[in-house]
A protein has these predicted regions:
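Conserved glycine-rich
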Residues: 167-168
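Short helix-loop "hinge" at the ATP-lid/N-box region of the Bergerat-fold HATPase_c
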Residues: 96-97
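Short alpha-helical segment of the dimerization/phosphotransfer core of two-component systems
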Residues: 13-18
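Short conserved segment of the HATPase_c
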Residues: 128-141
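Conserved micro-motifs of the catalytic ATP-binding
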Residues: 33-38, 77-80
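Conserved catalytic submotifs in the C-terminal HATPase_c
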Residues: 39-43, 61, 66-76
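Short beta-strand/loop element within the Bergerat-fold HATPase_c
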Residues: 103-115
């Protein structure tokens, strides 16, 4: 019967959400306690970004987001843990999917400058950004209007803490409805 199928679908969605929240809480707890093992290696940030772009292409299309990605032709090598840097990028892209205004562009660019590798992601927010940038990386903090979307309020906090654990810097800039996040690492030698 249709009603039973709807209940099962809702239960499945809620259990998936609970599973994700639990994983986020465990990850946040490990990070804050320092109980996380990092395996550093040289990674090409260009390749990672291209992989994440591929993973999120369908989701971006579903939100009618036009991805403009500008990467340098030469490899942009950083020293990081591949699983953890993937999680950083995944959290940033999930954030774009949830909060970017549909029908707008998302800009992703990576550059090498003065021995540093910098990745920036910019988008126009669907909701007003009437709070301080540093509030967004506090645990469980979400803009009031965003409460209608799924999320734990941990995504940007986890992304920032994982970036810092890997000796990178993580900065958020807000300007009107423009949201920009920049992560920076030393260039690997």
């Amino acid at each position: 019967n249709e009603k039973a199928k709807d209940y099962i679908r809702v239960l499945d969605e809620k259990s998936q959400r609970l599973k994700q929240l639990t994983e986020d809480l465990v990850e946040a707890s490990k990070i804050s306690s320092g109980n996380i093992k990092l395996e550093f290696m040289n990674l090409n940030l260009n390749e990672l970004v291209q992989q994440v772009n591929g993973e999120f292409a369908e989701r971006f299309e579903g939100r009618n987001l036009d991805l403009i990605c500008i990467l340098q032709p030469e490899p942009l090598l950083i020293r990081a843990d591949s699983r953890r840097i993937w999680r950083v990028l995944e959290n940033l892209y999930v954030n774009v999917c949830k909060y970017a205004m549909p029908g707008t562009r998302v800009y992703v660019d990576a550059i090498k400058k003065d021995g540093k590798i910098q990745l920036s992601i910019k988008n126009i927010s669907e909701n007003p950004l009437n709070f301080q940038a540093d509030e967004l990386t506090e645990r469980f903090i979400r803009g009031d209007v965003s409460r209608s979307t799924e999320g734990s309020g941990l995504g940007l906090s986890i992304a920032k803490n994982l970036t810092v654990l890997q000796h990178g810097s993580f900065n958020i800039y807000l300007d009107g409805d423009l949201f920009k996040v920049t992560i920076t690492f030393d260039e690997a030698v």
